[in-house]
């Protein structure tokens, strides 16, 4: 079994860490959890933040918290264009043909999942693992997903509610509430996001 967790990770924060830790708590026998940062258009990219920076920060998150068997996959970044989840999962399936795949997804996305490209094909490749449990049980799923309820699992998550975009909009003095010390240190050293930590 492997887990797939995608996102902008711009920057990686305690909410991401909570999802990762929850995955390993509920599925300790998994072979790996694969983090897949999205490709970010140069027109949307934050000032001074490169794909290399995001990959480095993800590696810092893994190492700082001693998270086992967690990898970073660059498949979407390498494409240099927007990727659809179905394309990414087909790549993962070709790379791990014998593994059961779980795709981690937030509750906001599960509510509009039927609008995703080839969502039925996604469910042929992977089971969905839903975090941020606003949906309490399978009877609360959107109507179009109820027939696939056997392919959808729920995972309790940490109480940290954050998004990378919301964090970027905060005063820098508040970033320590949402980022690990080593990531904050890296951001400061590299002068990312236009901020520097006060001395």
Which residues are covered by each model-predicted region?
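Nucleotidyltransferase catalytic core that binds NTPs
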Residues: 1-199
